[in-house]
Amino acid sequence: MRRLLCALLALLLLLGGAAGAEEGRLWLHGDFESVETDGYRLQNGFYEYEKIAHKGDISLYAVGYEAESGYALLTPEEAGGDLTYERMEDANLGAAQAGRWRYTDAGSRWDFLAVEAEGFFFSIMIAVPETGAERLDEEVEALISSLSLEAEPTDDTPMLGADTSGFTLVMDTLADDGGGLGRVTAWAAADGGVSVTFQRGAAGEYPFDSAEHLRETFAGEDAERLEDVYISGQSAERWRFTLVLADGSECPAEAVLLPGEEFSYAAVFGLTGGETPENAAMLERLLDSLALS
């Protein structure tokens, strides 16, 4: 996870000046049993959405792109190819109607949904095993009926955050880590001077299962302990250290760690633009505004 963190901070450094349509992002909701991933990433200045979720023998794979990203939403008729598609009745996803097609390929039966809404387009693919697919028809229809595009993610658990005005959201993803929905959000200042990642994980899962593991993962052995900070009335450890990024460069960094009974939290701040008075002031603003909400 520390290697992933270094790579993420290096990415934030590159994307510091990127701009994307943070407003209007839509999340796919539905009656799922488990969620592998669900969220947005900023790629080449545009947001991309991905969701992988399951219910019994049914698997859903969804991707979404901003309309101006350069990608195109093609219906099966437009895409061509050798597969035979059956046109199905449109599905209502709340924010828009989705065209629907059915086909078989690679040992699975697929329902393909295509939808455009609020400046984004989404491709949603629902797969069941081809053998015995008919016995799952009712479950597939029930799952499709439960799908909706909403302005907020399916997440009722408090998340760590701060005053990120003037920052660009680079990533916001959820994933079922075995004990509940974990979440990662990452932000970069417009000038690339400061970046921050916020992480939440179930307290029963490594490295969120103890304060020691949080320190090992997010601060490291050579970190300097600073005065604790308070987050929503709870005391949290603060550490200062140097991260060696994926490209080999060094980055002054700080971590704030908040263990909990159900969920634990970590915030990692990178002075990706160096230790300047402006970046130090921005870091203090972030630290002073840390809160669970």
Positions of predicted regions on the chain:
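Generic alpha-helical hydrophobic packing signal
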Residues: 64-67, 98, 200-202, 234-236, ...
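A short, amphipathic edge element
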Residues: 77-87, 216-228
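Residue-level signal for short segments within beta-strands and strand-turn junctions
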Residues: 64-66, 151, 200-202, 243, ...
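N-terminal targeting sequences that direct proteins away from the cytosol to non-cytosolic compartments
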Residues: 2, 6-7, 11-58, 85-93, ...
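A short acidic-to-branched-hydrophobic micro-motif
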Residues: 50-75, 127, 187-210, 268
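Extracellular C-type lectin-like domains
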Residues: 112-114, 254-257
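Residues that form generic nucleotide/phosphate-binding pockets
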Residues: 73-79, 146, 213-218, 289
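Short, Gly/Ser/Thr-enriched beta-strand-loop segments that form substrate-interacting elements
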Residues: 95-110, 235-252
